[in-house]
């Protein structure tokens, strides 16, 4: 079982903590989420603590990341979306650093666990719902009845739209967790075959591993982007009632 491709996703307790009957132990997942947050904060602190008119490469890279998130909000929501930059930016950076941290040898990918991604998705879902009711009041409920729907079809459409709305955090979290888990399992399996092939083909299989790692890094970045862009689209639905 120790050589199973799924063994890398095992949750291991590091510090056993129980409070009011709940198990809130500090695990390997906890430490990698904390580490991802610390690395992100350190990166942006080093990039911006001594900003210059002629920016350093680190500052330029941080500004590119910030502008990427700002552009996502601008394109999906417009000026009204600027107030959500702190939330959306934090989500993007946390997912991005967690995904990339999971690519390091002998590490742990927190975003491969549905409980982590579902928590992030619930934050988005609750924000969208609260913003919708605060901005539009009960008119927000018209989101569940598309304009021009015939009266006889209204009950069915309301049920379908409500189910679709409630399924958003599930699909958002499953997409991220499933992609991260599938990528790591595939990499683990192929790496195992490659080690066996090296007995006969010497160093020839190594480029295959390098290509796969490069592809997995691309997927890690892409999944952070997809999670964020979908969050922006959901916010747009609440703000502009689309």
From Swiss-Prot:
It comes from the Bacteria. InterPro entries: ATP_synth_F0_asu (IPR000568), ATP_synth_F0_asu_AS (IPR023011), ATP_synth_F0_asu_bact/mt (IPR045083), F0_ATP_A_sf (IPR035908). The keyword Nucleus does not apply. Keywords: ATP synthesis, Cell inner membrane, Cell membrane, CF(0), Hydrogen ion transport, Ion transport, Membrane, Transmembrane, Transmembrane helix, Transport. The keyword Kinase does not apply. One of its GO terms (molecular function) is proton-transporting ATP synthase activity, rotational mechanism. GO terms for cellular component: plasma membrane; proton-transporting ATP synthase complex. Belongs to the ATPase A chain family. Key component of the proton channel; it plays a direct role in the translocation of protons across the membrane. PANTHER family: ATP SYNTHASE SUBUNIT A (PTHR11410:SF0). F-type ATPases have 2 components, CF(1) - the catalytic core - and CF(0) - the membrane proton channel. CF(1) has five subunits: alpha(3), beta(3), gamma(1), delta(1), epsilon(1). CF(0) has three main subunits: a(1), b(2) and c(9-12). The alpha and beta chains form an alternating ring which encloses part of the gamma chain. CF(1) is attached to CF(0) by a central stalk formed by the gamma and epsilon chains, while a peripheral stalk is formed by the delta and b chains. This is ATP synthase subunit a. It comes from Rickettsia akari (strain Hartford).
